[in-house]
Each structure stands twice: as structure tokens, then as C-alpha cells.
Amino acid sequence: MTIKLNELIQKSKNLVFFTGAGISTNSGIPDFRGPQGIWKNSTPIYFQDFISSNDKRVESWERKFSNELSIDSAVPNTGHIKIAEIMKKKEESHLITQNVDNLHQNSGIQEKQITELHGNATYASCLDCNKRYELIDLKQDFLITKNPPSCNRCNGIIKTATISFGQAMPEAEMQLSQKKAIQSDLFICVGTSLAVFPAADLPVLAKETDAKLVICLLYTSDAADERLR
């Protein structure tokens, strides 16, 4: 960490971190849009296809249980741990993440300090009644039957607790993230391409409301570069 950034963090009273897939690559989880990203070699399954097609649900669960994203064995890296150390000293700080790997929680950050914009891939839930399911139980049944799981309470469709392409963003989480961005005096982006909307609007919102903006990443989209100038 540079001396300048450390000074900004020390002086900040409303620090917000905004993280994307790039922070987790050193934990063995590939990002999505980088040169070796997931979507270079795999096509995403859209939400409407998932709910309307049994075959697509089977494909989705096969991908999940093949550990495509290496989430099960991943542990927090130095980036996660450093952020956790900073946030432990700053109780008013907040973290907004696009990641679904649960590594920020595993690094020691309190749940109340984290907003997950794209959900969490370490468990599943019913799309109708929201009943939570642990993946280990679903995996055992799926490997035997090859049928996509359905809710034992309401017979609804079960899906990993993530936001898929074409699925509506969680309203409460978006509103809280926008509020935190507006209130921030220092907004630090780590490992995000700033290419996924509406989340990519958050650093712009922070900048427009006079927060100092810091971007720590290997690459951004051209559109993001232009909007943040």
C-alpha cells in the first residue's frame, strides 16, 4: 500500500471498498472478463432460460457441482485479509462486493459491513419461498438422480443464491450500496472491471458526491475509463 493511500485511509471517516472478481484470482478463482476469464471459454446461462428449461437447469447444476469456479477450496488471500484488517479498525467502513465467493466473510469482515450485489454462491435458495438449502445436500441428490432440485416446502425452483444474467438486481442491496457511495468520503475499487451495470455506476456516484476515488485493478473497460475521468 502506498504512503498516499494509507494517509487517505487513515483520514477517512466513511470508507467504502468496492470489490470485483479480480481480488479473488489469487485465491484460485478465475475472473469473468479478464484475458483468461470464465466468459472467454463458457457461455452464461440466462435467468429466463434457467427457469423455463429443465435442460438448462441440469446444465447449470452440472457446472456448479463440477466446481467450475473453484469456490469450495478457495481461501482468502492477502488482499481480502488486508481489507479486513483495515475495516476492523474502522467500524463505520463498508464493503460492497460483486463477488459471490464468500471470501470477504471468511476473512473476518462482519456481515453487517458487507453488501453482496450479486448474491452468494456458497448456498442455494428457492425462487418462490426463499427457503435456504445447503449445497452439499443438493449435490448428493443431484449426482444420484441427475434431476435439478426443487423445493421440499413449495415445489419451487431452487437456484444458487446468485444473480444471473437477465435476473433483476436485489433492490434493497442496490439502494444500500447507493446510499453508502453517496455517504463515502473515500471510495476504493479493487479488482473490478467496472463493466457491469448498475454496479459500475457506484464509483461515479461517489465521485459526483465529492468522495476521493481510488481504483486498484489490472484493467478497466474503455467506457469505465471515460466515465471516471
Task: Give residue spans per PLM region.
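Single conserved hydrophobic/aromatic residue that forms the stacking wall/gate
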Residues: Y219-R229
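Conserved catalytic core of sirtuin-type NAD+-dependent deacylases
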Residues: M1-S221
